[in-house]
Amino acid sequence: MSKTSNSNWETTVKPIVVLSVISLVDSLLLALVNSMTAPVIAENTKRTTLAAYVGVLPSVSDATELEEVTGYTTANVTGVVKAPDGSLAIKAEESGFDGGIVTVIVGMDANGTETGIWVDASTQTKGIGSAVAEDDFLKQFDGLDCTQNVVMGENGVDGKTGATFSSKALFAAINDCVNCYNELA
């Protein structure tokens, strides 16, 4: 009888206990690593965002010149800053291919003309969806009137061939920025 009981322990219960302990230890280690790296990741994200804001606003040379804007209600807009000359940089995020986020920052002067655009499509398929962030593709938006929504295939702006979901996400995020600009204007 004890042999059957011992056999049941060895074949059924022991593996479950061992795997549970291993899973618990792994979870604790992952939580520890996450708590140590989360502040570093947040700081790097903030630094990247501030650099992108400065990059899309030609009148600004340093992020300390920017003033954070609040009070907007436009969906998917995650940040707005204002330069001393009244130009704005607006950040929006939309879902691209496979749910990956496409982040867009559009700079607009006080008249609503696009002054720069920055795109992070690193979550999109490399070489296909990520191509919506390439400078050659983004040049088509130079000087665009950002007081009206941008329609893919109209006014000289086209989507990226082979990157339908990423292109739609890019245009949706740009239009989120346009809508926010109009809300704040």
Role assignments for model-derived ranges:
Residues 2-185:
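Flexible, solvent-exposed loop/hinge segments and secondary-structure transition points
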